[in-house]
């Protein structure tokens, strides 16, 4: 196995480099790859270069050149002269807010209504409600993704496509809401409202 994982890591890195060079379409590729890798935990390998290296962009903030959209975002937060956040935040982060705040809780609601037996539906309400609230408040989506993947793998593919389209929507409209961990209500309020 020692020779397999470096090849997989290199392939993921190649997709990342491709996405970083394609603008808005690259944000679609980024979103699709990111969501597809969530269920196996490999999304960390994919997104980290965008957050911390030149793959996520390079910008001058306060006279200092900074690499990576998250590093740039954090530097801009500290810079009183910032009037608008770095554009690559729209390409590689803001789309997550659409998904964590709206799509994933709606998926929980759809799974609830898809249960035909009302007794079983009532038993799963607490489970699905806790998943939806966790996602909405903190942006942690893995429990919903696993439930969806086990319930209907084809819908998981559709969910990944919707996730990617959220990135495109933010890239086209120029929505630049940064984050430090995930894209739940807490970070939306901190970085998108206040």
Tell me what each language-model feature is:
Residues 48-50, 54, 119, 148, ...:
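Residues in flexible loops and secondary-structure boundaries
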Residues 2, 19-23, 40-41, 97-101, ...:
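Hydrophobic alpha-helical scaffolding
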Residues 2, 15-19, 90, 94, ...:
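A near-ubiquitous, low-amplitude feature marking generic local secondary-structure context
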Residues 1, 48, 91-119:
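Transmembrane alpha-helical segments in integral membrane proteins
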Residues 60-89, 105-109, 113, 127-194:
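Transmembrane alpha-helical segments and their short flanking loops
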Residues 21-92:
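Interfacial loop/helix-cap signal at membrane boundaries in integral membrane proteins
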Residues 1-53, 171-174, 178-194:
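Signature of multi-pass transmembrane helix bundles
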Residues 16-29, 80-84, 118-127, 155-158:
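Membrane-interfacial loop-to-helix junctions in multi-pass transporters
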């Amino acid at each position: 196995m020692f020779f397999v994982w470096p090849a997989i890591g290199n392939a993921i890195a190649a997709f990342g480099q491709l996405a970083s060079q394609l603008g808005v379409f690259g944000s679609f590729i980024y979103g699709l790859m990111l969501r597809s890798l969530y269920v196996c935990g490999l999304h960390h390998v994919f997104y980290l270069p965008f957050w911390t290296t030149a793959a996520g962009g390079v910008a001058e903030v306060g006279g200092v050149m900074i690499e990576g959209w998250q590093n740039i975002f954090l530097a801009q937060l500290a810079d009183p002269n910032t009037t608008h956040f770095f554009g690559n935040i729209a390409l590689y982060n803001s789309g997550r807010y659409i998904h964590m705040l709206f799509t994933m809780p709606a998926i929980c609601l759809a799974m609830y209504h898809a249960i035909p037996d009302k007794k079983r539906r009532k038993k799963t309400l607490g489970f699905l409600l806790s998943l939806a609230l966790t996602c909405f408040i903190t942006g942690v989506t893995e429990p919903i993704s696993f439930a969806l993947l086990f319930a209907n793998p084809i819908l998981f593919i559709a969910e990944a496509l919707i996730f990617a389209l959220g990135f495109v929507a933010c890239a086209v409209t120029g929505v630049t809401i940064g984050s430090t961990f995930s894209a739940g209500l807490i970070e939306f309020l901190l970085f998108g409202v206040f």
